[in-house]
A protein has these predicted regions:
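Conserved, mostly hydrophobic/aromatic
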Residues: 11, 106, 179, 215, ...
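Conserved small/polar residues in nucleotide/adenosyl-binding loops
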Residues: 396-402
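Alpha-helical packing segments of well-folded alpha/beta enzyme cores
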Residues: 17, 21, 98-109, 138, ...
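Metal-cofactor-binding active-site regions of metalloenzymes
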Residues: 33-174, 331-346
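His/Asp/Glu-enriched, well-ordered alpha-helical/loop segment
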Residues: 280, 344-391, 395
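Short catalytic/ligand-binding loop motif for oxyanion handling, primarily in non-cytosolic enzymes
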Residues: 15-18, 23, 114-116, 122-128, ...
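Catalytic pocket-lining loop regions of alpha/beta-barrel enzymes
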Residues: 137, 150-151, 156-159, 164, ...
Length: 403
């Protein structure tokens, strides 16, 4: 397909360097945070004193090839066991670790630029949540590594998001200020309720208003990315984010739907809490969470609007569309997602170089054929650029937010 515009990939990942979590970490705090351990000749992270098996090889060397599960997610017409696909390894590539090499590869892939998100960083808050201070210590160290190795804006082509948590609201505000000073164009968080020193709280509890108020004022986009959200299977399957290829078997599980359930609950709760009314400059981008949850979420919003007239102050679905951008899975029906959200609220993201990604980002282009040229440009480029552009405003008062 010939394009008359550039393409921006809104979901790329790096693989963390060996010292990503420890370079800026006081070794004395290792037992509470992140350490390395060698068990049976294999290296593992130890998180808060417990060995993590969230990934098979936390060194990422060797690593499965990008998009090796593409055919499986496309429908698995050949009936192959996905564990067999994951055993096709290669040495870690320099573009997974270094921005200069990544920019070169972006050019080879035909991309103008990308948003860059963590791999391990997206799944380490949950195992540490029992110690909120350790969460903050860990991700402060992680973000300092990230700023050193990748920067938050590399040549205007790689925009890397620091990871923030609401485990401590004062820390979150302080870390947000630091990120803004460092030139961050967006921040990334997980779709889950944080555990604080007083227990689990909704991210939209008023105790977190200092953080959301500063986000609202700065006009920076908050990316809510798929993660270990802590979503429970309620006994129908073991909880926890774990991969163990040594078992040699794979079967369907209710856990396969945890990602869409987590983002559904997060965004629905955000809407029901009146968050968009209270913070009218918020921009939320849901990345790598898919889009199948949208019809059910919209149905529930309309139902609640009828049961609580005036609560939202506006049509809640239209309010949602004004504040939320959706990155569908590449296997989602793009035309349907655009019909639900509008072309100006959908962003392309390949998830490269993860195993469930597209082998090459522009393999997505055939999915955009049903769109008009203008809508295609929005999805493939313009919407991402809008999200990466800060939209600062004066502090909103509650009266101003109601107008």
């Amino acid at each position: 397909m010939e394009l008359e515009h550039p393409v921006w990939d809104a979901d790329n990942h790096y693989y963390e360097a060996l010292d990503a979590f420890t370079r800026h970490l006081d070794p004395a705090l290792g037992p509470r945070t992140v350490q390395w351990a060698t068990i049976d000749g294999r290296q593992y992270h130890v998180l808060g004193g417990k060995v993590s098996r969230a990934v098979t090889n936390a060194t990422f060397d060797p690593i499965s090839k990008p998009g090796c599960l593409h055919d499986y997610f496309r429908g698995n017409a050949t009936g192959v066991n996905p564990l067999e696909l994951l055993r096709d390894h290669e040495p870690i590539r320099p573009e997974y670790l270094h921005p200069g090499d990544r920019v070169r590869v972006l050019g080879e892939q035909g991309l103008a630029g990308c948003f860059l998100f963590p791999t391990l960083g997206m799944i380490y808050e949950e195992p540490l949540k029992h110690d909120p201070e350790a969460v903050c210590i860990t991700f402060r160290a992680f973000n300092r590594w990230l700023a050193e190795d990748w920067t938050f804006d590399y040549e205007g082509r790689i925009l890397t998001a620091p990871y923030l948590s609401l485990a401590d609201v004062d820390w979150a505000v302080e870390e947000l200020e630091w990120a803004l000073d460092q030139g961050a164009r967006m921040i990334v968080m997980r779709p889950g309720a944080p555990t604080t020193v007083t227990g689990v709280r909704s991210p939209f509890d008023t105790s977190f208003d200092p953080f959301w108020s500063r986000v609202n004022e700065a006009g920076i986009t908050v990316v809510i990315h798929a993660s270990d959200s802590g979503q429970s299977s309620n006994g129908y399957a073991p909880d926890g984010f774990t991969v163990n290829l040594r078992q040699g078997t794979y079967g369907p599980s209710i856990k396969s739907f945890n990602i869409e359930e987590a983002i559904h609950d997060y965004l629905l709760s955000m809407s029901l809490a009146g968050h968009f009314k209270r913070f009218p400059n918020l921009r939320i981008a849901s990345v790598e969470n898919g889009a199948e949850f949208l019809p059910d979420l919209f149905r529930k919003l309309r139902s609640q609007d009828k049961k609580a007239p005036g609560w939202f102050g506006d049509d809640p679905v239209e309010q949602f569309r004004r504040h939320v951008w959706i990155n569908p899975f590449w296997e989602d029906d793009l035309e349907t997602v655009v019909s639900l959200m509008g072309a100006d609220r959908v962003v392309f993201g390949s998830d490269w170089p993860h195993i469930e990604a597209l082998p090459q980002p522009l393999d997505y282009l055939p999915e955009t054929k049903p769109l008009s040229p203008d809508d295609r440009r929005l999805v493939l480029h313009d919407n991402a650029i809008e999200l990466a552009t800060a939209r600062p405003c004066l502090l909103y008062t509650s009266d101003a937010a109601d107008e």
